[in-house]
């Protein structure tokens, strides 16, 4: 079935809405749903009625936790929107959304401008090369300053942020904006919830300013594309001769090439500027065609290939989110990069191996759904029937098996023990933990070998608190949790080797395995790699996989204090076997023993998570705050002044940050705030290492 005209690839936009917490992301999305006809009533976040925040925890806390997907139509385009969380504990949601988007709207608060979390999200978008347009929201707030917000984008994000609108008034007097492309003013009607506005001449007191801003915009566009001599000549000789279409085409080109970030303004809460933002998304954001070909690895030829966004090509898709729906069970969200997906199709999962059949296809609107028979290139679909697929898996047709670039997930930094309140809940708890860890790759579940306790680990206290809450609500499991603990790691500092034999003889058939390993430190953050360099069959092929499994198990429990060993390169170099006594289990046990024997010789050390901490404090309390951070083994990496406050940037070990919010409140009489996010892992000082090992 051919796709409808509105859904042609050139008319498709896959966008995310990203920002700092409280910049108004969900409110903006609610307005988009309202004006595009998706919802007939505006849901307010502070009333707990926002459509996109559909989890009970989100409605209570007024924050967005999972990236809800929804589809809207505006003018001639189909827009898939992913609303992403701004809280740092849910960075994975932002990361996985950006991986499958073609463009993003970055929201900034007109009062605070660029905040620490905005920098994190911007960096993530840089990593995936996602084009962005900026929307300065909350122009009706006390202290709103559009031009200061643009300045902070340029200074802190190094963004090429150029206004394409000029606000008319600010704070309580914010009336609308001037469109610098059309050189017309939009004045909004409050009585129609902003659905109507008057297009008028530019107010006389703003005319000169707008002419100057337009000239700056055109000059910037001319320098972006020096090959377009016609455009440059018109800008230099007669800028008024440029048509709207020519200017829009130049803006679009700059956005699609990721060289230009147009800045719009408005107040989503007061219903001003949202329709103009939608117009900008359609006019300037890239379609899957503009994003071009996607790199993939062809498993038949073992070569890199380029996938063309085309419905007639073989199917290639990426699973980017798994959710458990109370009515339909497991939902797998996918982005289709090429081909057409029909209900009932069997897909090859090249990441995990094996085929699975899709029984139903759904188009999602926050937590409502619409059944569809097929989806096309560029679409974001929710599939039912995929039991094995997890986040980051490649799904394709067996005619052309390929692998798409995999997604990377940060290591958890905090852990706690969890146990069911009653024995009867043990199985339910195991199911709940399994289900939640499939949904969220940054949530890990392990068992402490010594105590038998179940340990959950995640990206922060709020992250684990919300998952604990979900167990109660969604899975009906009552569980007790221990105090939060730091998720330490171990690593090695020098190369080493081991020659290990595992021999067991107790009458009858014995057990025999012999494994020799060479291990050395890997690059920081690169993870573990285990490679078999066995030649000549000294260890038979069928025993290599169990040996690797044993080594991986050894890596997962470390040698100093039972923490994961990370950033270790392991080569299996030699070994031997016995025709009768060797078996898979013997080689698995021997692999684990050999790894530990080698690691003990390699001067192992404990690593601790270091947090990037940004404290905003009145100047009067700056000395106390810095002194306290130093006492916490923190390193001050910089500070800046912003609107009468000082922002202190520091790197502090997570173990020193428990209970920090209470102390900061008393240090600053409740006037300082802070945000923190995981930065990297670093060696702990030897004295602290000894204390950790004793515990």
Curated annotation (Swiss-Prot):
Subcellular location field: Cytoplasm
- One GO cellular component term: cytoplasm
* Swiss-Prot/TrEMBL GO biological process terms: ribosome disassembly
Keyword hit for Nucleotide-binding: yes
Out of the domains of life, which is the source? Bacteria
Q: What is its main location?
A: cytoplasm
Similarity annotation: Belongs to the TRAFAC class translation factor GTPase superfamily. Classic translation factor GTPase family. EF-G/EF-2 subfamily.
Query: Mind telling me which HAMAP family this protein's record contains?
Result: EF_G_EF_2_B
Its job: Catalyzes the GTP-dependent ribosomal translocation step during translation elongation. During this step, the ribosome changes from the pre-translocational (PRE) to the post-translocational (POST) state as the newly formed A-site-bound peptidyl-tRNA and P-site-bound deacylated tRNA move to the P and E sites, respectively. Catalyzes the coordinated movement of the two tRNA molecules, the mRNA and conformational changes in the ribosome.
State the NCBIfam families in the record.
EF-G, PRK12740.1-5, small_GTP
Q: What is this protein called?
A: Elongation factor G
This chain's source organism reads Protochlamydia amoebophila (strain UWE25)
């Amino acid at each position: 079935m051919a796709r409808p005209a509105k859904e042609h690839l050139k008319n498709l936009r896959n966008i995310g809405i990203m920002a700092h917490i409280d910049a108004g992301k969900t409110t903006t999305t609610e307005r988009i749903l309202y004006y595009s006809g998706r919802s007939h009533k505006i849901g307010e976040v502070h009333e707990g009625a926002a459509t996109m925040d559909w989890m009970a925890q989100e409605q209570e806390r007024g924050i967005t936790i999972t990236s809800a997907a929804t589809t809207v139509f505006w003018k001639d385009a189909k827009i898939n929107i992913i609303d992403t969380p701004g809280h740092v504990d849910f960075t994975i949601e932002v990361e996985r959304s950006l991986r499958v988007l073609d463009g993003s709207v970055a929201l900034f608060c007109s009062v605070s401008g660029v905040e620490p979390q905005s920098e994190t999200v911007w960096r993530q978008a840089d990593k995936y090369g996602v084009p962005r347009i900026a929307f300065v929201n909350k122009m009706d707030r006390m202290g709103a300053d559009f031009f200061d917000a643009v300045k902070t984008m340029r200074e802190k994000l190094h963004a090429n942020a150029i206004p394409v609108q000029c606000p008319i008034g600010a704070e309580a007097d914010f009336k609308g904006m001037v469109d610098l492309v059309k050189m017309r003013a939009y004045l909004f009607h409050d009585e129609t919830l902003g659905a109507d506005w008057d297009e008028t001449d530019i107010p006389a007191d703003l005319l000169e300013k707008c002419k100057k801003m337009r000239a700056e915009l055109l000059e910037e566009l001319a320098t972006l594309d020096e090959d377009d001599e016609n455009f440059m000549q018109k800008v230099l000789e007669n800028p008024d001769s440029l048509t709207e279409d020519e200017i829009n085409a130049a803006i679009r080109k700059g956005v699609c090439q990721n060289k230009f970030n147009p800045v719009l303004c408005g107040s989503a809460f007061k219903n001003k500027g949202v329709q103009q933002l939608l117009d900008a998304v359609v006019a300037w954001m890239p379609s899957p065609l503009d994003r071009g070909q996607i790199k993939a690895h062809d498993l038949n030829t073992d070569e890199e290939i380029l996938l063309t966004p085309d419905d007639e090509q073989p199917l290639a898709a990426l699973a980017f989110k798994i959710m458990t729906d109370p009515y339909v069970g497991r939902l797998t969200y996918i982005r289709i990069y090429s081909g057409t997906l029909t209900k009932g199709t069997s897909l090859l999962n090249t990441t995990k191996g094996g085929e699975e059949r899709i029984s139903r296809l759904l188009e999602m609107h926050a937590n409502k759904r619409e059944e569809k028979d097929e989806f096309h290139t560029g679409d974001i679909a929710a599939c039912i029937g995929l039991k094995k697929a997890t986040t980051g898996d490649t799904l394709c047709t067996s005619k052309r098996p390929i692998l798409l670039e995999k997604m990377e997930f940060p290591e958890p930094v905090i852990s706690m023990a969890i146990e069911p309140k009653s024995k009867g809940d043990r199985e339910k708890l195991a199911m709940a933990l399994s289900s939640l860890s499939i949904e969220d790759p940054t949530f890990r579940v392990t068992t402490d070998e010594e105590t038998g306790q179940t340990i959950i680990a995640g990206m922060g206290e709020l992250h684990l608190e919300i998952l604990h809450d979900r167990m109660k609500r969604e899975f009906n499991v009552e569980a007790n949790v221990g105090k939060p603990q730091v998720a330490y790691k171990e690593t090695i500092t020098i190369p080493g080797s081991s020659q290990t034999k595992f021999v067991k003889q107790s009458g009858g058939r014995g057990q025999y395995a012999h494994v020799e390993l060479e291990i050395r430190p890997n690059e920081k953050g690169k993870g573990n790699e285990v490679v078999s360099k066995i030649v000549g069959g000294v260890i038979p092929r069928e025993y290599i996989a169990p040996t690797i499994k044993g080594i991986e198990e050894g890596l997962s429990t470390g040698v100093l204090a039972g923490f994961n060993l990370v950033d270790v390169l392991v080569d299996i170099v030699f070994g031997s076997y016995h025709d009768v006594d060797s078996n898979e289990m013997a080689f698995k046990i021997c692999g684990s023993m050999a790894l530990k024997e080698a690691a003990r010789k390699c001067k192992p050390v404990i690593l601790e998570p270091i947090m990037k901490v940004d404290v905003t404090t009145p100047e009067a309390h700056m000395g106390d705050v810095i002194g306290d951070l130093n006492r916490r083994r923190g390193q001050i990496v910089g500070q800046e002044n912003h609107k009468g406050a000082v922002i202190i940037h520091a790197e502090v070990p997570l173990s020193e940050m428990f209970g920090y919010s209470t102390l900061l409140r008393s240090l600053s009489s409740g006037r300082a705030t802070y945000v923190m996010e995981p930065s990297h892992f670093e060696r702990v000082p030897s004295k602290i290492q000894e204390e950790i090992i004793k515990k």
